[in-house]
Amino acid sequence: MKTIYSTLALLVVIATSLHAQDTATHQSNAGIKGGYNLSAVSFDGDGETGQRHGFHIGVYGESFISESFSIQPELLYSQQGYEIKDANGTFTQKLDYINLPILLKAYPSKNFYLEAGPQIGLAISHKEEYNGLFSSSQEYDPNNFDWGMNFGGGFKTGSGITLGVRYHLGLGDLYDQGKAHNRVWQFSVGFDL
């Protein structure tokens, strides 16, 4: 009889342990991420420009503040900018940023998350290219500081691999004259370290 009770107790302990592993809470972590950028600029009154293709790469740290919520600061290098095409040629504004987003992440389920939060950015380089019939001597000098909001979501595996999509809604003026704001779609892959 003692053997039966001991065996039952052992089975209960094993079953509880397996269940706890299956429903384990999220753990704070750090990692690297990178991916594809699709960026444009919204000019007030003139609509949105053509898109520039680029990439982003950087590091993140995720700290859980409850079972379903975390805060994730990131430090990213990001290629942004825009393109304008007309009958005479193509103008491309290439802007490279160091961005610092701070995101609140919500996990409605174990693997899916939604995120939102502010971002500040510092332009570290800019370059203008004009390919067409006539060359342009006009200089565009963008502001060095950018800020805005990010919104996104994604999927995170139990092994720490993340697939995410994010939209950056720039709120800072890109140029001193006129209203122009960054708009960036980011498609990312991240790896917890």
Which residues does each PLM region occupy?
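Cleavable N-terminal export/targeting peptides
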Residues: 1-26
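Outer-membrane beta-barrel channels and translocator barrels
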Residues: 25, 66, 107-109, 158
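Residues that define the transmembrane beta-barrel architecture of outer-membrane proteins
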Residues: 26-28, 49-55, 94-98, 143-149, ...
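Transmembrane beta-strands of outer-membrane beta-barrel pores
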Residues: 36-40, 63, 77-81, 120-124, ...
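Outer-membrane beta-barrel "beta-signal"
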Residues: 37, 152-161, 181-193
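Outer-membrane beta-barrel translocator domains and adjoining extracellular loop/strand segments
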Residues: 42-48, 83-90, 126-133, 174-181
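Outer-membrane beta-barrel architecture
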Residues: 58-60, 101-103, 152, 188-190
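Repeated loop/turn-to-beta-strand initiation elements of outer-membrane beta-barrel proteins
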Residues: 68-71, 112-114, 159-165
